[in-house]
Amino acid sequence: MENSENVNYMILGKYFIYSIIAYEDFEKKQKNIEDFTIYIKDENNEIELTFHPNLAKGENPMLGGKTSLGRTVVYLISKKDKKIIKINYQK
């Protein structure tokens, strides 16, 4: 992993809560969260969070969103109820 200590990142509080909701499910089924990149898409009534695994050193990309570090999972969370309404594991 590259040294990124001098890079600043930002996540808005309104998205942080949805990340926590998704992470509570993610940690039961996946590996190390530090091996994933999280993408957030704000829809009208839902938030979509995609947890995409990084590539291990020397690993080549494969079709289907899976690497030796885990597999891609997409969470759809209701803005109103703040509950997961759909989970999609990519193959």
Q: Residue ranges of each PLM-predicted region?
A:
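Hydrophobic transmembrane signal anchors and adjacent membrane-proximal interface regions, especially
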Residues: M10-I11, I20, I38-I40, P61-L63, ...
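Short, compact, well-ordered microdomains
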Residues: T67-K91
